[in-house]
Amino acid sequence: MEETIEDPPTSAVLLDHCHFSQVIFSSVEKFYIPGGDVTCHYTFTQHFIPRRKDWIGIFRVGWKTTREYYTFMWVTLPIDLNNKSAKQQEVQFKAYYLPKDDEYYQFCYVDQDGVVRGASIPFQFRPENEEDILVVTTQGEVEEIEQHNKELCKENQELKDNCVSLQKQNSDMQAELQKKQEELETLQSINKKLELKVKEQKDYWETELLQLKEQNQKMSSENEKMGIRVDQLQAQLSTQEKEMEKLVQGDQDKTEQLEQLKKENDHLFLSLTEQRKDQKKLEQTVEQMKQNETTAMKKQQELMDENFDLSKRLSENKIICNALQREKERLEGENDLLKRENSRLLSYMGLDFNSLPYQVPTSDEGGAGQNPGLVYGNPYSGIQESSSPSPLSIKKCPICKADDICDHILEQQQMQPLCLNCPICDKIFPATEKQIFEDHVFCHSL
């Protein structure tokens, strides 16, 4: 499949949040035959604009998020969106990457934000000749899938309710945290104002005390009144100090609560990070299993090719063997004919074929003059090699009184051409080129 190593953009968007009607799939079959490429036809609606990272995936029926795709192909962007033909597009899925089971699947168009923009009707991957058998099973599976979809919708609604509850709880906590922060800022501002006021008032009191001391020296009669005034001011200062301590203690409590909320937030973030790591490990495991499956199928194909080559060579060897067997039978037939012809000629000459020496010469006797293609050899080799003809082996013709009847027969036999025929290509070789003939036949088996 012509897809890049980069994973497509996905999201955990729920089914109710998708816009399935913005891309329309057409010409979707009820089932596709395994082993063949599948072409997906789709059409963009008027207000939908495709983007570069959009993709079409094959999902098993009952999927929840776009991360559950089986395989995908990138979408080809049309050159002119205003053209009507540009709205109708297609993409082809290679047979090797398609599902191998008979579950129900559907095409889904996903944009680069991971949001589903269109979904097709369900279909299967199964052989065509099983259509009649699968009619009842398909209906049962459809009912089972509908029941499963109802359960998934119910579970989905529960998850959405939980999600809304968690979102509301999170929103309340954020609002409470914001409120606490505002209160803390207000308290800090009040604290600063009080500190400034206390400092100013303390300075004022010190100045007033100094003035009172100066006045004490001048007005001894008013000393008691000023002492009472000092006591009152000191009591007021003590009360304000206690109030300030309470405010400081409240500020510390709010700070501790804020730290506790920060710790809880960090704990939740760490938990989310661990879950993402586990999900990434699972995705890597799935990818490794796909690679192992690809390697095994390649190895199986290589073994099948090797088995085919061996079968082909075995068939060729059988053909050569049969051809050699036929050639052997033909040569044996020719030898039998030659033996009968020799017996006839010897009978005509008055000689007994069985009483002749050198009838079946060995490899050391007369080997140079024999035909390498014959099994029984030349029956006249002994007569040709003798230095003088025996009176018992040669008879004169009673009619013509000729002594050269044997020479005539030998001359006629030597004039007969002996050839070797290739049983495969029918090429003819002289009898003296037996080695070349054998090398030629052996080359056919390579």
UniProtKB/Swiss-Prot annotation:
It comes from the Eukaryota. A motif (LIR-like) lies at residues 203-206. The modification Phosphoserine is found at residue 445. This is Calcium-binding and coiled-coil domain-containing protein 2. Dimer. Part of a complex consisting of CALCOCO2, TAX1BP1 and MYO6. Interacts with MYO6. Interacts with GEMIN4. Interacts with ATG8 family members MAP1LC3A, MAP1LC3B, GABARAP, GABARAPL1 and GABARAPL2. Interacts with ATG8 family member MAP1LC3C. Interacts with LGALS8. Interacts with TOM1; the interaction is indirect and is mediated by MYO6, which acts as a bridge between TOM1 and CALCOCO2. Interacts with AZI2. Gene3D superfamilies: 2.60.40.2840, 6.20.250.40. A motif (CLIR) lies at residues 133-136. A zinc finger (UBZ1-type) spans 419-444. The keyword Zinc-finger applies. GO terms for molecular function: zinc ion binding. InterPro entries: CALCOCO1/2_Zn_UBZ1, SKICH, UBA_autophagy_assoc_protein. Residues 137-349 form a coiled coil. Belongs to the CALCOCO family.
